[in-house]
Each structure stands twice: as C-alpha cells, then as structure tokens.
Swiss-Prot record:
Name of the featured protein: GTP cyclohydrolase 1
Homology family: Belongs to the GTP cyclohydrolase I family.
Pathway noted in the entry: Cofactor biosynthesis; 7,8-dihydroneopterin triphosphate biosynthesis; 7,8-dihydroneopterin triphosphate from GTP: step 1/1
Gene: folE
Lineage: Bacteria, Bacillati, Actinomycetota, Actinomycetes, Mycobacteriales
Domain of life: Bacteria
Source organism per UniProt: Corynebacterium glutamicum (strain ATCC 13032 / DSM 20300 / JCM 1318 / BCRC 11384 / CCUG 27702 / LMG 3730 / NBRC 12168 / NCIMB 10025 / NRRL B-2784 / 534)
Amino acid sequence: MDNHAAVREFDEERATAAIRELLIAVGEDPDREGLLETPARVARAYKETFAGLHEDPTTVLEKTFSEGHEELVLVREIPIYSMCEHHLVPFFGVAHIGYIPGKSGKVTGLSKLARLADMFAKRPQVQERLTSQIADALVEKLDAQAVAVVIEAEHLCMAMRGIRKPGAVTTTSAVRGGFKNNAASRAEVFSLIRGH
C-alpha cells in the first residue's frame, strides 16, 4: 500500500546545507541579511511539508465504530496541500472522500478522513497517486464496500512555469467496489460530490 515505508528520517542539517547551496546555484548570496536564516527556515518548512513520509497514514483509520451504518458517508471540500514530486512546487485544492461501510458497518471519525488525506499529501506526490492511495486505504482498513475519492487541485508547476496557466484545475478520481461496478451508484455519489 505505502511505497514510502523504508524512508530515512528527515535530516534538517543536510536540508539546510542543500538550500544554502541552491541559493548559491541560482546566483544569490546566502550571507546577505534577508537570506541569512532562509536555509534553516526552508528546511523546517520542508520537514513539516514532507512529514507524511515518516508516518503510516492508515493508522488514523484504526479507531472505528460499529454503527451498523450501511449508507454513504461523504466529506466534501477537504482542503489539501501537497508538493509536486516532479518540480517540488505546491499543488493545492480540495478532496471529496466518500465510502459505504462494509458488512461490519464499521465507520471512522469524520476528521479521520481529512487526516488521512493530509498524511498522504505531506510527501512528494502526484495527484493521481494521492487520490488512489486515499481510496485504497479506505478499502483496506475499513473494508468499505464502495469508495469514491475526487481531488480538484491547482498545480503551481503549471501556473508559475512551463505552460503558465494559473487557475487551471486538475480533477482526479478513484472509485472502488460498488461505485466502480455500479454506474447508478457512481453517478449518485459524483452528483453529491458536486453538491447537486
């Protein structure tokens, strides 16, 4: 499930030195007043931004409740922030996460869905994989009979470089189980995600 399991711990000292070298490489003076603390600040920011590399996101789904609930659970408009692994610039937007509990009726706390998305997002990432990882975790840990995850995000690698199209939104979806196999159920959950 999580292909980042063997990642080494964050090396803040090494990251600070690397940022200092990057400033030199782009033609800046890392010893000028405005940049003196920048390497350490950026290293601390990256430590937080990539914290998901050092966590197993599926652990947030270990606490469940046997509610006997057999219908859709959907949380919409969950803000997400991640870093494009190709350019190491942010992408950000919203995730919509829905599932129908399995036969056991196990549900998780609503905040756990947002936490799951955050933990998978806090690593070098691509939106397509992020979407699938969230869906697969719900199937694996909750034994959900149907899962739908939709992410809508703006990628700064498209907005501030290359094609330069700010405001362009990329939408990805991952459907599992009943939502994948039943067109009517899939259409219903996508309609609810759109808010109609």
